[in-house]
Design a protein with these regions (language model features):
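Small-residue-biased structural context
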Residues: 1-146
């Protein structure tokens, strides 16, 4: 099985594909944008919850660091959830310009966020949690969201 770092980095790539699909559909029709936006939000929320409910909890339990990088990542997740909510609202009122502006802001935040996780947090997590990688990955894969 892969490492925690490999698993979560790969999942970033999967979410990026949903984002690209969402951007592409926005240029074609608002209905297509709505569907792909919902798919992106769902998959991104699943990724956030895999981190927050499993990996962050395991990392904090093992290291005792609760106010460090995981706290910052949770804060950034909340910022991105807020942007995604605003994207939904813009699509609900057919405001394509606002939607596109929000997606641009989200893309920048996501890129910066993912870089921090992939270059800092995931290697730290792997260092502390490597003995439990398989169990942690299995737990993350079992996350279900509504």
């Amino acid at each position: 099985m892969s490492t925690i770092k490999e698993f979560l980095t790969s999942d970033h790539g999967r979410c990026d594909e949903y984002f690209a699909d969402m951007e592409k559909n926005a240029t074609e029709s608002l209905e297509g944008a709505k569907e792909s936006c919902e798919a992106f939000i769902h998959e991104t929320e699943k990724h956030f919850q895999m981190e927050e409910r499993v990996m962050f909890e395991e990392f904090e339990s093992k290291t005792g660091m609760t106010e460090g990088p995981t706290a910052m990542m949770r804060h950034e997740h909340e910022q991105m959830r807020n942007l995604m909510s605003q994207m939904r609202e813009a699509l609900d009122v057919d405001n394509k310009d606002k939607y596109l502006g929000l997606t641009e802001t989200l893309m920048i935040l996501l890129q910066q966020h993912n870089m921090k996780e992939e270059q800092m947090l995931y290697p730290m997590a792997q260092q502390h949690l490597s003995a439990d990688s398989d169990r942690i990955i299995d737990m993350m894969q079992s996350i279900v969201i509504d």
